[in-house]
Every structure is written in C-alpha cells, then in structure tokens.
Amino acid sequence: LCDQVHSGSYRPQPVRRAYVPKADGAQRPIGIPALEDKIVQGAVAEVLSAIYEVDFLGFSYGFRPGRSPHHAVDALNAALIKRKINWVLDADVRRFFDSVDHEWLLRMVAHRVADPRILRLIRQWLLAGVLESGKWFKTLEGTPQGAGISPILANIFLHYSLDLWVHVWRQRCANGEVIIVRYCDDFVMGFEKPTDAESMMGDLKRRLSKFGLGLNEKKTRLLEFGRFAAERRKRRGMRRPETFDFLGFTHYCCMNRKGHFFVMRKTQRARMIRKLKALRTEARLRMHWPLRKQQRWLAAVLRGHYGYYGYLGNSRALSNFAYQVRKLWFRALCRRSQKNAMTWERFNRLLKVFPLPVPRIVRT
C-alpha cells in the first residue's frame, strides 16, 4: 500500500453509503471507506493536522488534539456568563458535509500544502464516488461523513470560509462584544448589541453563499439570552428567555443561590429520546443473553451517558435516563419468558444482584 501511494498507482475505492437517524427524525448519510483507504486517509489526516493546528483559531474545537465537546461547551458557558452577551445566534449550516465545494477546498489546502501527492490523494478521495444499493454515484461536491479525512478537511474549509472572516468581522464591523464557539459545522455566536446580531445574520448568509454553503432557515435562530434577558422580557410581558441546543445540551438562563446569573445545561430532549429508542431495539436483540452480560452492557451505556451529560444541574435528566434504562431492561426481561413472569418486585431483587450504576455528576 505504501509503495502504491509513492508510485502513484494507488486508487481509492468508492465509499459505501449508509444512513443514521438524526435528532429531528431525518436520516444523515455517512460514507464508509474501504480498509486500505482508511489507513491512507488516517496518515494524511495526521500530516494535515500537524500543519494546520498552528493556524486554527482558539474558538474552533471540533476534532482537534486535546479538545473535546466538553471544552467547547465549557468555553461557551464561560463566555455567556463573563462577557456582555445579550443575544445568541444559534446557527445551523445546511447539509454542510454534502455541500463542500471541491475546488474551493483544494485551493484552501494548497494554501499551506505544496506537496502535489497530498493534493492528488485528496482530489481522488473527493471524486471516488459512493456505492448505494450496489450502484455507483458520482460525487461532484461534498466530503463523506465517516471518512477519516473528512474532519480535518471540514476544519480547513470552515477555517478559511468562516473562522478567519468572523475574527476580522468582529474587530472591524462590531460595535459591541462578539463571541463564537465552533465545533466542526455546529457553531453558536453571542452579541452584546442587537444591531451587531442582525448585521451578522445578513453578512453570514452572503459569506457562506460565496463558498456554496447556506444556513438552515428552520434551525437558525436569533434569540434574546444573557444576564438581563429575563428581566427585560418580563418588563415587556413576555415569557422567560428561550433556550438553545449545542452539542447535545439545552442551554438556559437561571440564577444561582447567590442571585448571580448562570447558564445551566441539561440533556437535549431529542437526543435522549433517540438514544432510548436505539437502546430499546438493542435490548430486544440481546434479551436472551445471560443476565450478567446484559448488566455489563447496560452499565457501560449508563457510565458513558453520565460521563458525557453529568453536568451540575442536570441531575433530573440523568435520573430520568437511568429510570428509562431500568424500565426497558424490565420490559425486555418480561418478553424473555412467558412462564416465569417478571414483576417489579422480582426485578428490584435482581437489580441487587446485577446492579446498574446510579447517576453521577462528574462535571461542574
């Protein structure tokens, strides 16, 4: 494989198209590359990451070394609390991975990468096509989600098309404070002045359209949010401030015990419903497994859930998720045997022998 890459005889295979459910009920297409392509893409991704890591801006968090969704959530939380933010732009780029313009992307990569072999490999991957239901389809635009090279290519594309532009815009055009936190194609902006927020909406649409991108109008919202939002809305006879979702969390305004403004996070409802639905399907498939094996599987699921969503203030959602997991296990065991009917009393005794982890707060 190494010799093929160096000699130029390497030819990538089309990616296999599959679909995974999204939080809104739609299907997200992903591309599954062949093993050889995964290996080569992984090597090239490491090279590109080493080159571009020094260029990427501080508010970009997705798929970067030493950064995680929690770093992005914490950075957003700190900015909303400590900075003068009164308005939030919850932006959603429409079908980003399917809409990446190949020529723009290759020009952006060539800005920092002079090796023609790297550029040729990237072009080959972009044009390899997809296999769906046994049929081959051309890929004239986009980079498939699921491919090992796609995250770094997405960051490069958004670095030039969005990040650098926003950085200059808030220095030259804004009249008040402006913050942004981006995780791959998901980003949130905060504004001190409503005029800045409204100007950004128009300018952002024009900027993205230049690169073949656009905002999802149904999911992109400008909302009043911040330390004074509740008081101002109350004076106008309006309800409490709206909430917004980012990286699986619903963010909302509140006051702590000392009366200071705080931003709390809870599990995004749509995400939890989708996860429980998938677990119910899995539980039916595993209902004839030995009880110890089932318990280990569900315990791992719960620990992973607590590890991601275990923020201070999210106890109710964590407890609800734990209850729903116990409930779906109970129902799966009820289907397992018609002779020895499972009751809640018997199930609770079983939980003492095969306990499940209790909700834990692991992040503040």
Can you annotate each of these PLM segments?
Residues 1-364:
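Non-catalytic terminal/accessory segments
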